[in-house]
């Protein structure tokens, strides 16, 4: 059983690398700019893959860019079939990866809490 999961992980890493190359070399849609593939999760049967992506640019454009990628999934699957030797290329689904934004918010909250604590200590030391 664990062998299936390690194979799925290896296939996911391979798809991540090849999708990144496809975005650089093949995808010419002007609505999609600077796509980063964070990671790819492949189902244990290797039939479906979720590609987690981020975009550089305005946050408002994220949903439109995701829609464009999901519409181009067939084109990208065909491109993968030309580059990767797998019996079946997984069906692609693109999902926005908000982990970077979430990390940024958490970091800001931590910085704010540390600043409050530092301000509180400096107020107590002056008394």
UniProtKB/Swiss-Prot annotation:
Subcellular location, record wording: Cytoplasm
InterPro entries annotated for this entry? KH_dom-like_a/b (IPR015946), RbfA (IPR000238), RbfA_dom_sf (IPR023799), Ribosome-bd_factorA_CS (IPR020053)
Q: Which UniProt keywords apply?
A: Cytoplasm, Ribosome biogenesis
Q: Which GO terms describe its biological process?
A: maturation of SSU-rRNA
Chief place where the protein resides:
cytoplasm
Taxonomically, the superkingdom here is Bacteria
**Keyword Secreted carried by entry:** no
Q: Which SUPFAM superfamilies match?
A: Ribosome-binding factor A, RbfA (SSF89919)
- Entry GO CC: cytosol
One of the record's GO molecular function terms: ribosomal small subunit binding
To which protein family does this belong? Belongs to the RbfA family.
* Subunit annotation: Monomer. Binds 30S ribosomal subunits, but not 50S ribosomal subunits or 70S ribosomes.
The record's annotation in NCBIfam families points to: rbfA
Describe the task this protein carries out: One of several proteins that assist in the late maturation steps of the functional core of the 30S ribosomal subunit. Associates with free 30S ribosomal subunits (but not with 30S subunits that are part of 70S ribosomes or polysomes). Required for efficient processing of 16S rRNA. May interact with the 5'-terminal helix region of 16S rRNA.
Full protein name: Ribosome-binding factor A
Organism listed in the record? Nitrosococcus oceani (strain ATCC 19707 / BCRC 17464 / JCM 30415 / NCIMB 11848 / C-107)
What does the organism's lineage look like at the top? Bacteria, Pseudomonadati, Pseudomonadota, Gammaproteobacteria, Chromatiales
Q: Gene name on record? A: rbfA
